[in-house]
Each structure stands twice: as C-alpha cells, then as structure tokens.
A protein has these predicted regions:
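Glycine-rich phosphate/diphosphate-binding loop of Rossmann-like nucleotide-binding domains
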Residues: 2-39
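Residue-level preference for the first positions of well-ordered beta-strands
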Residues: 3, 59-60, 115-116
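C-terminal binding/interaction regions
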Residues: 8-15, 32-34, 91-139
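Short glycine/serine/threonine-rich phosphate/pyrophosphate-binding segments
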Residues: 13-18, 42-45, 67-75, 96-99, ...
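Short, glycine/charged-enriched secondary-structure capping and boundary segments
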Residues: 19-22, 47-49, 75-79, 101-104, ...
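N-terminal beta-loop-helix "entrance" segment that forms/cooperates
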Residues: 31-55
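Glycine-rich phosphate-binding loop
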Residues: 46-91
Length: 139
C-alpha cells in the first residue's frame, strides 16, 4: 500500500534521492517515484497528478525539479482542495552547483490557499521531506 508519491522533473534529479529513499526504506515506507516534466510533458504530468487522487491511501506528495522548479507548484495547484500535504524541493542540475534564487522563490511564494512546504534543496532538502513524510505516514 503506497502512502507516499514522489514526483521529480527529470531523471537527472535521481542522484539527489539516495539518502531520502534509504531513510524511507529503513522506516519501511513504500513509495512510488514518477519522473514527469511540467514543461516538456504537461499532459503526462497532469494525468499523473490526477491519477494519484485515485489512490485513497495517499497521504503525502514530495515533488522536486531543477531549473524553473515548476513541478511542486503545479501539483499544489491541482491538489489545493485536498488534505494531502505537498513538500517541494529545489534541485540543481548537478551536485555542487549553486542555487538559482528565482526558482527557489517560486517554491516559497505560492499564492494564498495553495499550500506548499519548501524543505530545502538537493539531497538534504529531499531527505528532510522524506523525514517529515514519514512522521505524517506513521501517525
């Protein structure tokens, strides 16, 4: 039974998931990881988000992307009328690269009534999101 959905914008974001996925495995939390770009594949992304609503056991979504970092905000917009918390992470294009502040600002300045929690960037931000998700799922 999957309680956690993880959506990332590109396969190049995968290196940042290692510590968080390891943490979830230690806590025995099953998750589904989907790669879908809001900019390159908007229809697929929309379909994936709407499909997630069919999973009545879904408790948390973690979403992250690089460059414009639109994915977490799009998900938050679609799911604003649900009780599903969404954690957003900002990924750089590669480990060690500096953060582009404009994209980070996208995550921390959502419109009112469109909740999205920004948990940081890269591997550390993803790990923090996984830790928070585990707390929600285990309660």
């Amino acid at each position: 039974m999957v309680h956690l959905l993880i959506m990332i914008g590109s396969s190049s974001d995968k290196p940042f998931l290692h510590a968080g996925l390891e943490y979830l495995q230690e806590k025995k939390i099953d998750c589904e990881v989907i790669i879908s770009s809001t900019h390159r594949e908007p229809q697929k992304t929309s379909a994936e988000i709407l499909m997630s609503l069919k999973n009545k056991n879904l408790k948390v979504i973690i979403a992250g992307a690089a460059t414009a970092t639109g994915l977490p905000g799009v998900i938050a917009g679609y799911l604003q009328e649900t009780n599903i918390p969404i954690f957003g992470i900002r990924f750089t294009k590669e480990p060690g690269q500096s953060i582009i502040e404009d994209a980070t600002f996208n995550l921390s300045s959502m419109p009112s009534r469109v909740p999205l929690a920004y948990t940081g960037f890269n591997e550390k931000g993803f790990l923090h999101a996984c830790m928070l998700a585990a707390r929600i799922i285990k309660t």
